Swiss-Prot record:
One of its GO terms (biological process) is translation. Part of the 50S ribosomal subunit. Contacts protein L29, and trigger factor when it is bound to the ribosome. GO terms for cellular component: ribonucleoprotein complex; ribosome. This is Large ribosomal subunit protein uL23. Keywords: Ribonucleoprotein, Ribosomal protein, RNA-binding, rRNA-binding.
């Protein structure tokens, strides 16, 4: 698996923004990715970033209904990435203007 295919997108929610201020970043990742691969992908995608810890969560599919038809959403995997104290911060929203 290519390192640049591991991270799909950042998760932007109220809970993830609370963790963002504590130095933890939440990403949606490929369901086949393991913790070491996620760590390597984050360090390759963001220059100057050192990962201290990776926690993963498997999100189960939810039942959804459209009229009388029932289906399920896709299963996903989330990764909570903690950076070391001497690491650069990840800019999720681009550079700040002065």
């Amino acid at each position: 698996m290519n390192l640049y295919d591991v991270i799909k997108k950042p998760v932007i929610t109220e809970g993830s923004m609370a963790q963002y201020e504590a130095g933890k970043y939440v990403f949606e990742v490929d369901t086949r990715a393991h913790k070491l691969l996620i760590k390597q992908a984050v360090e390759a995608a963001f220059e100057g970033v050192k990962v201290a810890n990776v926690n993963t969560i498997n999100v189960k599919p939810k039942a959804k209904r459209v009229g009388r038809y029932t289906g399920f959403t896709n299963k996903t995997k989330k990764a909570i990435v903690t950076l070391t104290a001497d690491s650069k911060a990840i800019e999720l929203f681009g550079a700040e203007e002065e």
